[in-house]
Amino acid sequence: MLRFGANLGPGMLFSEYPFLERFDHAAAAGFGAVEYPQPYGEDIRAIRAALQRTGLRQAQFNLPWGDIPGQRGTTNDPSRRAAFRDDVARALEIAAELECPRLLCHAGVALPEIPFDVQWNTIVDNLHYAAEQAVPAGVRILVEPLNPFDVPGYLLTTTAQALRLLDEVGHPNTALLYDIYHAQRAEGNLTATLRAHLHRIDHIELADSPDRHQPGTGEINFRFLLGELQTASFAGWVCPEYRPLGSTEESLTWLREWTTRE
């Protein structure tokens, strides 16, 4: 049976409610976990209380993205190595407080003044450091490709690039976050990719393409893809990360149909 979690990030599921109230609505809708990108400006004790109150799990959250809008991480910046290590420590402290077993480390947006190979090697070194630091905490480090239309300049846009990065990092405490929406926009070939690489995927996010709304509003056959994941006994969380058309509750028809089918 697939496990579904709700993305409570800005503009995503249950955004019509204040942040901490979204946990209650997610639990009432049948989700077993939540995720959101950046908890750093929130009251962590209040989040922990919301998780305990609702019985939800914290599936994952991101390492800090940095101070520049659109930055998507400092992992590629050789001048920010010390700051990156501080960010890892901070994220691991919060992960311990929230009993969160995964942290997502974005690769960053290209820095035009720095050669690509320098940025790439910085990412490799930083990811290895993060993965090693996370071992004692029982936290796995994830990487995620993002499509170049939504995030221009982002350094990982395909599954192949992300897997190459993980191979070069060479640490067993790393895995791939596969976002079905970003993958469809960037490269397509969803089914073949899942079949070939599901053993390296620890977490899945989804939205329909091309407009990032709920399943059934675009070009992706989610009934088929979810069936593939079910057949393969995928054990990670599957988290819708979309902008609902209508209310969030109205947008969850696809989930109710799937759970009834199960």
What do these predicted ranges mean?
Residues 24, 48-49, 93, 132, ...:
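Alpha-helical segments flanking ligand/cofactor-binding loops in enzyme cores
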Residues 35, 59-62, 104, 142, ...:
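Conserved beta-strand positions in the central sheet of alpha/beta enzyme cores
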Residues 1-11, 60-75, 107-111, 146:
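N-terminal small/glycine-rich loop or linker at the start of catalytic domains
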Residues 27, 52, 96, 131, ...:
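Anion (oxyanion) recognition and catalysis
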Residues 35-54, 62, 107-115, 150, ...:
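Glycine-rich, proline-tolerant flexible connector loops at the mouths of alpha/beta enzymes
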Residues 1-30, 40, 99-101, 156-178, ...:
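Histidine-acidic metal/acid-base catalytic patches
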Residues 43, 68, 112, 144, ...:
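Generic structural signal for helix capping and beta-alpha/helix-loop junctions
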Residues 74-175:
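Active-site acidic/histidine proton-transfer and metal-coordination neighborhood
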